[in-house]
Amino acid sequence: KITGLPTTVEVATAKQVEDALAFGVDVLWVGARTTVNPFSVQEVADALRGVDIPVLIKNPINPDLELWQGAVERIARVGIKQIGLIHRGFSAYGNTEFRNVPMWHLAIEMKRRLPELLFINDPSHICGRRDILQGTAQKAIDLEFDGLMIESHIDPDNAWSDAKQQITPERLAEMLGEIRWRKEDVPSEE
């Protein structure tokens, strides 16, 4: 809260939800390894009952849209109104160009099923490395995702986790400036 910027954190248990709420976190997200387990999602959902906070839900690590949609339904059933989706790619066996294969067709299908939800893309987790981040972010924008979730660190090589997929704040600003945004804000008629 020192910076005045909104904060967000991943939650996987009721205790983590309680702690995040106690510390005034602005947005919560359910991670891919939690989304894959309906019992874990229900635990998080139960902890959110009666709370008014935006919740983002990452796709499960395996390519199963029913699990993803089920997580959305569980969170919605406890009264959460502001729900969004995060596409972070899916695990695949063997060597691929990506850390998590995008399987864009599955993301598009999920957007078709739940068009009213905010839908953002996490190219950091899809790529797992910096050198293909820009192209993947651009593809997400070309596919009309509503936004991007990109990991940034002042010293990426020394980050405690996922160091290879993080970029500096300066590189993030540069990348965002290079993206060709497809949607333009339409001025309101007042």
Language-model region placement:
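Active-site beta->alpha loop and helix N-cap motifs at the rims of alpha/beta catalytic domains
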Residues: K1-Q42
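Alpha-helix-loop-beta-strand connector modules within alpha/beta enzyme cores
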Residues: K1-V9, V44-P54, W104-F119, Q165-P187
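Electropositive, surface-exposed helix/loop patches at the edges of structured domains
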Residues: V9-A20, W68-R74, R180-E190
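Short beta->alpha junction loops/turns
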Residues: T13, R33-T34, P60-N62, I126, ...
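Glycine-rich phosphate-binding active-site loops on the catalytic face of alpha/beta enzymes
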Residues: V27-P38, L143-Q165
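Amphipathic, soluble alpha/beta structural segments
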Residues: L85-S91, A163-L172
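Histidine-acidic metal/acid-base catalytic patches
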Residues: K139, E151, D155-W160, P169-R182
